[in-house]
A protein has these predicted regions:
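Long, contiguous binding/interaction regions
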Residues: 1-66, 74-76, 94-169
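Short beta-strand-to-loop capping motifs
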Residues: 36-38, 83-89
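Aromatic-anchored, charged helix-turn/loop surface patch used as a conserved interaction hotspot
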Residues: 68-69, 75-86
Length: 169
């Protein structure tokens, strides 16, 4: 199913509201939120689900014994996972960055960490550099902003990454 810009913006607002609600219901905890990087108008497909399930498995493994709750949502606008932990926001962000940087599909994961007041932590808060582009390894935000790579290039790279991952499991 193709997603419009309006759908995407609405889903972001709903995700933010859900994050705030979780933090309100679970006072004092740190929230870890996983989504999948999936360029284009189709956000939910076989590739995004493979990546999402791999990301959730990585969260379960990396936050084992530290997870208060884990909620998963399979939406047309993409898969979302919400993990609540008693870890400090800095420790949670460190673990999230480790997943993004070491997992075979980690560059397809967008793992945000929010403190108890809802403030997101940046990668630089734990001494990490900016996210890298899937194609050229430059800073992803610049390539995205400048449309440095075509949608076909990005989708081909994502498909290649997922195919390699599936062959290994």
């Amino acid at each position: 199913m193709e997603i419009t810009l309006e759908d995407l913006l609405k889903s972001r607002d709903e995700r933010h509201a859900h994050q705030m609600q979780l933090l309100k219901e679970h006072e004092g905890l740190t929230l870890v939120c996983l989504t999948v990087v999936m360029p284009g108008s189709v956000k939910r497909n076989v590739q995004s689900l493979v990546a999402a399930h791999a990301g959730v498995d990585a969260l379960r493994e990396r936050f084992a014994g530290e997870t208060v709750s884990l909620e998963e949502r399979d939406l047309d606008t993409g898969y979302e996972a919400y993990l609540l932990t008693r870890l400090s926001p800095l420790e949670a962000k460190e673990r999230a960055c480790e997943i993004e940087e070491t997992h075979m599909l980690g560059r397809l994961f967008d793992i945000d960490v929010m403190d108890a007041s809802g403030c997101p932590l940046s990668r630089s808060a734990v001494g990490r550099g900016a996210r890298r582009c899937l194609i050229c390894d430059g800073e992803a935000r610049y390539c995205m902003r400048n449309h440095s790579h075509s949608l076909d290039e990005l989708q081909a790279r994502i498909n290649s990454m997922i195919d390699a991952y599936v062959q290994r499991i």
